[in-house]
Amino acid sequence: QYGDIRAALGRFQFSSDQVKSKLSQLSGGERARVALLKLLLEENNLLLMDEPTNHLDMDSKDTLEEALINYEGSLVTVSHDRWFLDQVVNRIWELQDGVITTYYGNYTDYVRAKKGLPPLADGEVSEV
C-alpha cells in the first residue's frame, strides 16, 4: 500500500522532497492536492466537491480530471471551471426558482440545450 500511495503522490506532482515534508510546510495549492488525493484514495462511492480545481495548476487539474473520469462512484460538484465540467460530468442539475431541471451530457451540452440547440455529435467542436 505504501508503494500505491507514493505512486499516487507522484501522479499529483509531489516530488520526493515534498513527500517527506510536513503538511504545514506545503503551499495552499499543495495542501489542496493532498486533500483531493486523500478523498480519491478512500473507499467512497460518493464525492461532494466544491470548486475542486481552485488552487490547482494545469498539471494537477489534468491529474484530477483523469482520476475523476476513472472514479467508479458518483460525483456531485459545484464548479465555475467549464473545461473541468466538460471533462468529468455527464449530467447537470440546474436549480432555478426552487425547481431542479436535469440536463444530460457535459457543460457544453447544457449550454446548447439552454439555447435550444441539439447536442454535438462525437468529434464535433462547439462554437457556443
Please report, for each region that a protein language model flagged, where it lies by residue.
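ABC ATP-binding cassette signature C-motif
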Residues: Q1-V128
